[in-house]
Amino acid sequence: HLNSVMNDKEIRAQYEKSLNLLTSHYGKIGQNKKLFSQYEKLYEQNRKNLTQSQNKLLENVLRGFRLSGVHLNVKKRKLFRECQEKLAKLESKFEQNILDSSNSWAKNFKTIENLKGMPQSSLEIAEETAAKRNEVGYTLTLDQPCYMAVMTFADSQSLRKTMYLAYASRASNKFPISCKWDNTKIIENILLLRQEMSQILGYKNYAEYSLATKMAKSTNEVIDFLESLKIKAISKSKKEMSVLKNFAKKHYNLKTISPWDIAYIAEKYKEENFGISQEE
């Protein structure tokens, strides 16, 4: 958490160092056969006398050992740990690229003219941001509070579009500042490592491996649930979008609603019909 909210070179270096140590440490614990056998012994000898919650706790611990590869031979255990460590580094780099690309983007306005509709609290933060950057006026960033305030309240469709496209393309080859933080290759490598780790443990794919700790019993069960949910969600969302489109056409002369318009129009609709505001 600290690495995300107070990120600098020193904290990042310590975070990377600690991440490597922790990943290695927990990987070795998860594959400690002696420790596993003690937990297994504790469970087998006492499960009849333990409460349901206590048994469940021990079962989860034992499952964690198995999902760490405790049952594998020496060669496969070593390979699995190597994959874990590589994966941890890639996931960390993935997050850093998003953070770095987000921090690289900012838009300054000398006056409040283009920021009409924005709440006073958001304008004050934008003013403080500008001052910290030795800029005059108001500076917007891709930080979540600032981004959501613009998408929800800014009257300028052009500003909302600019912010939306920048935010949606962070850490990609479409990012307007630079593509040096592009996560495409990292995502591909993460998927390959997850697949390799899953197969080492005897699963067909990462989805099956992931379900080992979840209530759903199979990938088909998950897909069926999502398909069922999709049907209900699409039906409901089409009705809601129809309402918003009619409202936008009537009050803002918008023939179509773009992704960067949805939060704004929805907010105006709530204010108009229910007398409530997200800011309040």
What are these model-derived regions, one by one?
Residues 1-118:
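N-terminal helix-rich structural modules
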Residues 9-19, 182, 225-228, 249:
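Membrane-interfacial loop-to-helix junctions in multi-pass inner-membrane proteins
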Residues 40-45, 140-147, 168-185:
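Short, charged, low-complexity loops and linkers
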Residues 44-60, 141-162, 194, 199:
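Acidic, low-complexity proline/glycine-rich segments
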Residues 53, 57-59, 86-89, 96, ...:
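Active-site-proximal, well-structured secondary-structure segments within enzyme catalytic domains
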Residues 66, 148-150, 176-180, 211-222:
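Second-shell loop/turn segments in exported
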Residues 69-83, 170-192, 196-209:
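A conserved hydrophobic secondary-structure block that centers on an alpha-helix together
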Residues 132-171, 262, 266:
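Active-site-adjacent "gating/activation" loops or surface patches in catalytic cores
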